[in-house]
């Protein structure tokens, strides 16, 4: 009996330490990704993103990155930066954008998206759905031939 209570005391005295999985993108740690130049970073992306970066970032994507830099710079330490609104749904997320808040336009409203490390290499559009998912209900009048015999409510 005494042995059982001793085992419980030993287990309760030391709380179990939680270990978090360290993020890596294609085998490269987040710290290294942030220090990496564009040329090395592009080599890690999938083919479509590589092609996009090799063709060069045009004026609008560069303007978005500049606005994100400014929002991060103006934010007080420890606080989240101000959201930056954009229509650029086809912008590929790069490590520099991590921690920023972006309002992505879905055709009607701006959905706020906080950029996390897991989003690297994806498009902004993937995180702001542009349609309302279908909620299938009962079929309407004229949906099938048998619906002629369904009374009108």
Curated annotation (Swiss-Prot):
GO biological process: ribosomal small subunit assembly; translation
One term of GO molecular function: structural constituent of ribosome
GO cellular component assignments: cytosolic small ribosomal subunit
Keyword entries, A-Z: Ribonucleoprotein, Ribosomal protein
Organism domain of life: Eukaryota
PROSITE patterns on file: RIBOSOMAL_S19
UniProt xrefs under InterPro entries: Ribosomal_uS19, Ribosomal_uS19_CS, Ribosomal_uS19_euk/arc, Ribosomal_uS19_SF
SUPFAM superfamilies per the UniProt record, alphabetical: Ribosomal protein S19 (SSF54570)
Pfam families: Ribosomal_S19 (PF00203)
Family from the record: Belongs to the universal ribosomal protein uS19 family.
HAMAP family xref list: Ribosomal_uS19 (MF_00531)
Protein name: Small ribosomal subunit protein uS19
Taxonomy of the source species: Eukaryota, Viridiplantae, Streptophyta, Embryophyta, Tracheophyta
């Amino acid at each position: 009996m005494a042995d059982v209570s001793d085992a419980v005391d030993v287990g309760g005295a030391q709380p179990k330490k939680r270990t978090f999985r360290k993020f890596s993108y294609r085998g490269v740690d987040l710290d290294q990704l942030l220090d990496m130049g564009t040329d090395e970073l592009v080599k890690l992306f999938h083919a479509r993103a590589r092609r996009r970066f090799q063709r060069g970032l045009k004026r609008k994507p560069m303007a978005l990155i500049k606005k994100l830099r400014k929002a991060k710079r103006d934010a007080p330490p420890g606080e989240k930066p101000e959201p930056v609104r954009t229509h650029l749904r086809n912008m590929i997320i790069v490590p520099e954008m991590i921690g920023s808040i972006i309002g992505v336009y879905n055709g009607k409203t701006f959905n706020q998206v906080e950029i996390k490390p897991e989003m690297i290499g994806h498009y902004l559009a993937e995180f702001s759905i542009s349609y309302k998912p279908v909620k299938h209900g009962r079929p309407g009048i004229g949906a099938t031939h048998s619906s002629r015999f369904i009374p009108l409510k």
